[in-house]
């Protein structure tokens, strides 16, 4: 395309074209080519541009495309030069009247370059000529009037500047010397103001149409992210994750650590900041908007971490070290001292929890999540013997099956407990002590890492963990449950006989259903990191999982085998660690709650999706059969569990209705009637705060290998019958009161029978996966691990508040009960399930439960957080560099006042000559640790300097060193960075004197002053110096200090060589031999010791290549020559050559001139 540039010439009124041409002809010779004044430079640049435009108009570009392309490139370069000089003139003439260009902060960094003005001019001329931007015809049409105004205004400015060149030019004048009273100067001033305003408007519109420009809202969001980075850095400095030295030295590792830590801080600590994922997506910065869903999942998992785990994750993100499971276990073991495996009080539980505040979840501090894994052992109901004294909390004498509740995820246990747990014996209730969260996590680690629980299904001596009769039951509301003890005894007996007959008929069906339910195993974790990609790291259960995290049938059988083979001592030790903080309420009440939580939970998921389901519809509690193992050696359990006739009828009919849980009510025909809840009722923990604190269940296991336990297994049927009668009396009372309180715990056997009855009822109706086995099956039981997610809240209200809350919630449950198809409800927490906070807790628990161990969870979070943070380095590199540069400036240590040096003798003269050297103002290191160059303390260069310089990393970690004086702030920074690169030492070189002269001059040379300055040397130099010193020490000659630098002539093309050490010698006492020895030493060491490399020219002082004068751009980067220190483009410095004189034995980058020079040498 041929670009036609119309140059309109306008003249002042009264000036004819002939006179102007004559003036040009007269003054043309006065502009010398070397004139550096602004007007002279503008005149030559404008004249060259006019010539190129004329040549372009003289031929058809389509006929000669190569020539046209070459001339267009020259045209754009000429436009850049003209506009650059025009900007300098406007800066001098307009000053503060220039148009504001604050909008440039919204531009991408790659747009802001020196050729931007020329591109804008070229685009304005194309638009004014009728062209359009590709695929942006609408924007082009809107910009065309403004483009025409810009080109017209620019031509007016060019004409008036040419006129001023002929009128008021002063050769080599650093400033403009225009006649202020002249009308032409005033017109020029106004023309420049108009052009500046129009050009700024066109710049904003044109760049916005070509590239994506940040809006005002996005810019403010990035400012908030910058503040988040700064707050994160300050927090990391306080917690010891980072060091102030790293900030002061601009450690490049912080460019990765700060964004990673900021993601955690924004999601967990500063929740209302820019990373608040609860706000709409439009209010989130575009930096994190693509990762919104992933960040939400990461936030949920981070809230489930304890403070210790969170600190370990942050440390891992800073150091990139491997996750050590032993360190986690050490933290867990420390928490063991706070929990007592024996008996304790509720106050001890609360104190134990407060003691480990550091292990609390980082989410809500007052609401914790407990994952309970229950091992159920079900056996045939061959009841023998009579257990005397079975009046306390329900144990194996009245329990229908043995349940071992294991806290498998230590998210938190309930605090503020006032009662004791319901783990009881035949003698009475027992009070369990607090079990700290570290202990729970310890159990969880063993359960998940070893693939089997650390307990056994064998029996143990219950007296070891019973506390006797010191627990007083808490009687809440129902005081009439002890009435009507003998009223329905005969009905219960009849029901028992009928149910035992029915169990034999349903045994085969139950086994088949259970095996079918165990075919689909539970997923215990997510993906293996090496076998997945970034997108599915936190994927939910809907996607297929990696096989190594899925529990197979073999693992399930191994799990049951290890459960059956563990010793009783291990079981007792684990039971002590299982019992969590005791909450208010008696044992019977808690047992009833736990049975309902474990049995009445969401049993309609045979595939056990609870561990990975992250959807909001996730129920807050699910019971999933994870393993099953026949156990023929288990002793028969109590067979005094009543089963109802409607239950038998329903199980015979084979109804396939899928239900959440069945509900128990009392009918008019002396037996209980069960119905199916058609509503998808979410089963949560109790609504009562007191009962919700009683989360961790009881331990009831049996085995015929323990005689003591077997005697208790054969409990008295009569006591069970009475407890059932009490349970019915309690239900009648609740039915007449129009609300459904918990049965009173004044009699623990009542709750035992009630639980047994409900358990039997529930197991018959949970036919979806039938984790219950009929009590009538012959000596063959099933051991199943049941993972139950429950939630518990801290009990912060007093008794009356809890009572009032319970009354209201039970009233709501009663209203729901009358509207539903069920006759009654066993879990009065349906109204509370709608609470969003409870659902969130359950979601977090389910999210964490899908990981095998804490190590796996931390590793997954590390990969995701590091992936998001590192992706920002690619997608928003320029914005991230700007923000990190601001963070470094804000958080760097204030500059310390320079201490005046205290030199003496020749040292003072040498150092003074060095410190006064102008080249010491700048010092640049050839190291990858240069994030922000040191000269930015005095210069406002762009952040691209460090990017261009970062490529010049010396493979041998060579460094450029300057003076050793402490007064330079650059030297202080260099010494901070010198941990892995340099060693700042004063090298003492031992040199042997000539033969015959070394012994005589030895004493004087030891006491003599230094002949050269002390300087810092790199590692390679230090090795050479030490080797040279050892070699010369064998000669027995005298010693003296010598500088590591050679003479002045050895530096070649170096522009900053210090004074020669020979010339700086003093007459402090050495005589002629001493002086001659110095000369000899300098020549000897010159061959072995490397010279000082030349100082690099600062990037901001080299806008163009020093060889071809090409301007540097983001694509034409700066490269320093290691031999001369000059700045060149990649074409002019594409050669490499070893430089032994500088200690560089490997090939390094050199410019072409130095390459020719070195090869010639």
UniProtKB/Swiss-Prot annotation:
Disulfide bonds: none
Basic residues bias locations: 438-453, 728-742, 758-773
CDD domains: FYVE_LST2
UniProt-listed InterPro entries: FYVE_LST2, LST-2, Znf_FYVE, Znf_FYVE-rel, Znf_FYVE_PHD, Znf_RING/FYVE/PHD
GO term, biological process aspect, one: negative regulation of epidermal growth factor receptor signaling pathway
Superkingdom classification of source: Eukaryota
Zinc finger (FYVE-type): 1099-1159
Biased composition (Polar residues): 935-948, 956-967
Keywords: Metal-binding, Zinc, Zinc-finger
Acidic residues bias (residue ranges): 488-510, 669-704, 896-910
Positions bound to Zn(2+) 2: 1121, 1124, 1151, 1154
UniProt-listed PROSITE patterns: ZF_FYVE
UniProt entry tagged with the keyword Metal-binding: yes
SMART domains per UniProt: FYVE
Region (Disordered): 417-510, 583-831, 890-918, 935-978, 992-1014, 1029-1095
Pfam family, one: FYVE
Bias (Low complexity) ranges: 583-601, 743-757, 781-800, 807-831, 1054-1065
Molecular functions per Gene Ontology: zinc ion binding
Family named by the database record: Belongs to the lst-2 family.
Name of the protein this chain belongs to: Lateral signaling target protein 2 homolog
């Amino acid at each position: 395309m041929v670009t036609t540039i119309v140059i309109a010439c306008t003249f002042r009124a009264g000036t004819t074209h002939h006179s102007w041409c004559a003036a040009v002809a007269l003054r043309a010779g006065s502009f010398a080519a070397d004139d550096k004044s602004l007007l002279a430079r503008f005149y030559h640049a404008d004249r060259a541009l006019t010539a190129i435009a004329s040549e372009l108009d003289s031929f058809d570009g389509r006929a000669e495309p190569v020539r046209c392309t070459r001339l267009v490139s020259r045209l754009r370069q000429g436009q850049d030069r003209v506009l650059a000089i025009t900007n300098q003139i406007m800066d001098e003439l307009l000053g503060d009247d220039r148009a504001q260009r604050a909008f440039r902060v919204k531009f991408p960094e790659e747009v802001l370059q020196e050729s931007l003005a020329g591109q804008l001019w070229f685009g304005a001329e194309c638009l004014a000529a009728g062209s359009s931007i590709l695929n942006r015809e609408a924007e082009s049409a809107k910009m065309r009037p403004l483009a025409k105004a810009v080109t017209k205004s620019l031509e007016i400015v060019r004409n008036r500047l040419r006129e001023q060149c002929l009128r008021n030019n002063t050769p080599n004048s650093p400033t403009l010397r225009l006649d202020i009273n002249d009308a032409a100067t005033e017109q020029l001033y106004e023309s420049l103001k108009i052009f500046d305003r129009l050009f700024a408007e066109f710049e904003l519109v044109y760049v916005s149409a070509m590239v994506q420009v940040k809006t005002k809202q996005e810019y403010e969001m990035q400012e908030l992210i910058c503040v988040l980075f700064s707050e994160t850095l300050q927090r990391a400095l306080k917690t010891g994750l980072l060091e102030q030295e790293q900030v002061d030295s601009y450690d490049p590792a912080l460019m990765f650590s700060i964004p990673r830590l900021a993601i955690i801080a924004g999601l967990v600590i500063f929740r209302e900041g820019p990373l608040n994922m609860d706000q709409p997506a439009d209010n989130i910065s575009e930096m994190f908007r693509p990762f919104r869903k992933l960040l939400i999942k990461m936030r949920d998992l981070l809230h489930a971490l304890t403070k210790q785990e969170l600190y370990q994750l942050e440390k891992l993100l800073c150091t990139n070290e491997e996750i050590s499971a032993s360190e986690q276990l050490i933290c867990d073991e420390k928490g063991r001292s706070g929990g007592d495996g024996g008996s304790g009080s509720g106050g001890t539980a609360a104190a134990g929890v407060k003691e480990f505040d550091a292990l609390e979840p980082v989410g809500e501090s007052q609401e914790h999540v407990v994952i309970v894994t229950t091992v159920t052992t079900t056996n045939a109901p061959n009841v023998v013997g009579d257990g005397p004294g079975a009046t306390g909390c329900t144990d194996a004498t009245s329990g229908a099956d043995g349940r071992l509740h294991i806290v498998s995820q230590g998210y938190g246990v309930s605090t503020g407990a006032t009662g004791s747990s319901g783990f009881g014996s035949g003698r009475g209730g027992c009070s369990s002590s607090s079990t700290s969260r570290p202990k729970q996590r310890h159990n969880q680690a063993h359960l998940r890492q070893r693939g089997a629980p650390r307990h056994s299904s064998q029996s143990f001596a219950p007296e070891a963990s019973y506390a006797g009769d010191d627990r007083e039951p808490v009687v809440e509301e129902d005081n009439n449950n002890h009435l009507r003890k003998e009223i329905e005894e005969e009905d219960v007996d009849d029901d028992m006989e009928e149910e035992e007959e029915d169990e034999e008929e349903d045994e085969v069906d139950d086994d088949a259903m259970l095996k079918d339910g165990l075919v689909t195993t539970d997923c215990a974790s997510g993906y293996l990191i090496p076998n997945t990609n970034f997108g599915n790291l936190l994927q939910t259960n809907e996607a297929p999982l990696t096989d190594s995290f899925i529990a197979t049938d073999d693992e399930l059988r191994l799990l049951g085998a290890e459960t059956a083979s563990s010793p009783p001592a291990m079981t007792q030790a684990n039971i002590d660690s299982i019992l969590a903080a005791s909450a208010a309420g008696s044992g019977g009440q808690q047992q009833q709650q736990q049975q309902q939580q474990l049995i009445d939970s969401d049993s309609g998921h045979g595939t056990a999706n609870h561990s990975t389901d992250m959807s909001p519809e996730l129920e807050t509690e699910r019971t999933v059969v994870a393993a099953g193992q026949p156990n023929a050696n288990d002793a028969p359990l109590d067979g005094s569990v009543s089963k109802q006739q409607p239950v038998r009828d329903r199980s015979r009919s084979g109804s396939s209705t899928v239900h959440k849980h069945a509900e128990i009510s009392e009918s008019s025909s002396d037996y209980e009637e069960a119905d199916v809840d058609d509503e998808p009722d979410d089963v949560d923990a109790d609504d009562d705060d007191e009962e919700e604190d009683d989360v961790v269940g009881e331990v009831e296991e049996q085995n015929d290998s323990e005689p003591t336990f077997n005697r208790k297994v054969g409990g008295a049927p009569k006591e069970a019958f009475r407890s059932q009668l009490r349970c019915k009396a309690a239900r009648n009372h609740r039915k007449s009161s129009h609300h459904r309180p918990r049965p009173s715990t004044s009699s623990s056997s009542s709750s035992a029978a009630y639980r047994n009855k409900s358990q039997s009822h529930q197991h018959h109706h949970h036919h979806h996966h039938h984790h219950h086995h009929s009590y009538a099956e012959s000596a063959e039981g099933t051991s199943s691990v049941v993972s139950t997610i429950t939630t518990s809240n801290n009990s912060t209200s007093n008794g009356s508040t809890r009572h009032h809350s319970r009354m209201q919630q039970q009233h709501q449950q009663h209203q729901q009960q009358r509207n539903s198809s069920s006759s009654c409800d066993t879990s009065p927490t349906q109204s509370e399930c709608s609470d969003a906070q409870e659902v969130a807790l359950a979601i977090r628990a389910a999210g964490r439960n899908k990981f095998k161990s804490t190590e796996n969870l931390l590793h997954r979070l590390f990969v995701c957080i590091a992936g998001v943070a590192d992706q920002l380095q690619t997608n928003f590199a320029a914005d991230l560099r700007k923000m990190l540069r601001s963070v470094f400036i804000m958080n760097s240590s204030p500059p310390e006042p320079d201490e005046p040096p205290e030199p003496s003798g020749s040292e003072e003269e040498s150092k003074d000559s060095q410190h006064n050297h102008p080249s010491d103002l700048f010092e640049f290191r050839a190291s990858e640790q240069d994030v922000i160059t040191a000269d930015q303390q005095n210069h406002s260069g762009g952040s691209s300097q460090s990017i261009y310089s970062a490529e010049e990393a010396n493979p041998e970690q060579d460094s450029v060193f300057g003076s050793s004086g402490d007064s330079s702030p650059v030297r202080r920074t260099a010494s901070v960075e010198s941990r892995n690169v340099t060693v700042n030492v004063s090298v003492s070189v031992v040199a042997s004197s000539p033969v015959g002269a070394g012994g005589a001059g030895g004493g004087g040379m030891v006491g003599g002053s230094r002949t050269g300055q002390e300087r810092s040397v790199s590692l390679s130099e230090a090795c050479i110096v030490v080797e040279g010193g050892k070699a010369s020490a064998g000669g027995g000659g005298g010693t003296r200090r010598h500088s590591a630098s050679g003479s002045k002539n050895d530096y070649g093309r170096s522009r900053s060589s210090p004074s020669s050490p020979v010339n700086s010698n003093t007459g402090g006492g050495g005589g002629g031999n001493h002086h001659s020895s110095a000369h000899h030493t300098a020549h000897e060491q010159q061959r072995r010791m490397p010279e000082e490399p030349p100082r690099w020219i600062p990037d901001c002082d080299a806008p163009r290549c020093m060889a071809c004068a090409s301007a540097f751009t983001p694509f034409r980067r700066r490269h320093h020559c290691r031999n001369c220190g000059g700045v060149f483009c990649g074409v002019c410095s594409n050669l490499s050559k070893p430089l032994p004189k500088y200690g560089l034995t490997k090939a390094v980058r050199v410019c072409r001139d130095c390459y020719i020079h070195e090869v010639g040498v």
